[in-house]
Curated annotation (Swiss-Prot):
Alphabetical list of PANTHER family matching this protein: TRANSCRIPTION INITIATION FACTOR TFIID SUBUNIT 11, TRANSCRIPTION INITIATION FACTOR TFIID SUBUNIT 11-RELATED
Gene Ontology terms: cellular component: nucleus; transcription factor TFIID complex
Phosphoserine PTM sites in chain numbering: S236, S238
Lineage of origin: Eukaryota, Fungi, Dikarya, Ascomycota, Saccharomycotina
Entry keyword set: Nucleus, Phosphoprotein, Transcription, Transcription regulation
Subcellular locations according to the entry: Nucleus
Gene that this polypeptide is encoded by: TAF11
Record InterPro entries: Histone-fold, TAF11-like, TAFII28_dom
Domain Histone-fold: 131-329
Oligomer and partners: TAF11 heterodimerizes with TAF13, but they do not seem to form a heterotetramer like TAF6/TAF9. The 1.2 MDa TFIID complex is composed of TATA binding protein (TBP) and the 14 TBP-associated factors (one copy of each TAF1, TAF2, TAF3, TAF7, TAF8, TAF11, TAF13, two copies of each TAF4, TAF5, TAF6, TAF9, TAF10, TAF12, and three copies of TAF14), ranging in size from 17 to 150 kDa.
Function: Functions as a component of the DNA-binding general transcription factor complex TFIID. Binding of TFIID to a promoter (with or without TATA element) is the initial step in pre-initiation complex (PIC) formation. TFIID plays a key role in the regulation of gene expression by RNA polymerase II through different activities such as transcription activator interaction, core promoter recognition and selectivity, TFIIA and TFIIB interaction, chromatin modification (histone acetylation by TAF1), facilitation of DNA opening and initiation of transcription.
Family in the record: Belongs to the TAF11 family.
UniProt-recorded Gene Ontology molecular function terms: chromatin binding; protein heterodimerization activity
GO biological process, one term: transcription by RNA polymerase II
Protein name, entry field: Transcription initiation factor TFIID subunit 11
């Protein structure tokens, strides 16, 4: 099995001291920060598109003016301010006059609109000519698609327990197509939300693994350096290599790997040059290589799932959202299977 290609390279277990240098540590640290920063920009852009439709969040907020209150005490109030009429004061007579003017203006515009009203065919042509390529393709597919006439008529006759006419069948066929389209659109939105949440989970994993990689590499690098003065000059950065990592008790694999990594990070024998210290360094290199493979394997991009099929969970969640949004859909009592009214067994 080929190893996943990525921005980071593994450390060989043989002849590794020449690789573990200060320059390698800072270049790898910079690479990890750069990858996480690019992923952060991508995640922020995706979340912004999901929440605001691509517009800036600041444009959706109402900017309230900031008032500066004077804390000086007023000893005497100005007499003119008591009898002063407030600005922009509107009296009932002004409101009635404004409503009368608006009514006359609307009547005039209504007469003009009736003369300039386009025919239905002209409106349809105007709509089609102003669609882009993607919208035109979707419109043509939706316009040509129709539900099966026989199945619609059979289903309606079964529910109504009578033969339905042809015009009712055409009406139910059109309404059913619109209803199915709304459910599918909601299912696509649900799928996009699920993919976005998975993207956030992958980003959190990559951030956590990147933080561990910097600690492991720093611990390995400074365990090789013997010059104490040189070590003190570069060791005081933002990466606490002796800080243990947290884990969850219900995740056995993560608990085992994190416990082993914490014991290696907090070990004082790495600074020595005996056989035990070499074994600890090899174990730390092995842990580092595992994290490198995981870091390279993670991908926060969700564009590769754009053409993925809809799942039953998406349709089920879309149906639930549709019922909440419409708030007028009656309960399907005929589907009840004994838990509620038991109408299916009557």
């Amino acid at each position: 099995m080929t190893e996943p290609q990525g921005p980071l390279d593994t450390i060989p277990k043989v002849n590794y001291p020449p690789i573990l240098t200060i320059a390698n540590y800072f270049s790898t640290k910079q690479m990890i920060d750069q990858v996480i920063s690019e992923d952060q920009d991508y995640v922020t852009w995706k979340l912004q598109n999901l929440r605001t439709g691509g517009t800036s969040i600041n444009n959706q907020l109402n900017k309230y003016p900031k008032y500066k209150y004077q804390k000086t005490r007023i000893n005497q109030q100005d007499p003119d301010s008591i009898n002063k009429v407030p600005e922009n004061l509107i009296f009932p007579q002004d409101i009635l006059q404004q409503q009368t003017q608006n009514s006359n203006y609307e009547d005039t515009n209504t007469n003009e609109d009736e003369n300039e009203k386009l025919a239905q065919d002209e409106q349809f042509k105007l709509l089609v000519t102003n669609l882009d390529k993607d919208q035109t393709n979707r419109f043509e597919v939706f316009h040509r698609t129709s539900l099966n006439k026989t199945q619609v008529k059979k289903l309606a006759s079964t529910v109504a327990n009578q033969t339905i006419s042809e015009n009712i069948r055409v009406f139910l066929q059109a309404v059913g197509k619109i209803y199915a389209g709304e459910i599918i659109e909601l299912a696509m939105i649900v799928k996009n939300k699920w993919l976005t949440s998975q993207m956030c989970i992958e980003f959190d994993k990559r951030t956590k693994i990147g933080y561990k990689l910097k600690k492991y590499l720093k611990k390995l690098t400074f365990s090789i350096i013997e010059n104490q003065q040189y070590k003190q000059d570069y060791q005081s950065d933002s990466v606490p290599e002796d800080e243990p990592d947290f884990y969850f008790d219900d995740e056995e694999v993560d608990k085992r790997e994190t416990t082993l990594g914490n014991s290696l990070l907090q070990s004082k024998s790495l600074q020595q040059s005996d056989h035990n210290s070499q074994d600890l360094k090899l174990q730390l290199i092995e842990q580092y290589n595992k994290l490198v493979l995981q870091f390279n394997k993670l991908d926060v991009s969700i564009e590769k799932y754009n053409n993925s099929p809809l799942l039953p969970e998406h349709i089920r969640e879309a149906w639930r959202l549709y019922r909440l949004q419409s708030d007028t859909l009656p309960n399907a009592y005929w589907r009840t299977q004994g838990e509620g009214q038991g109408s299916m067994f009557r």
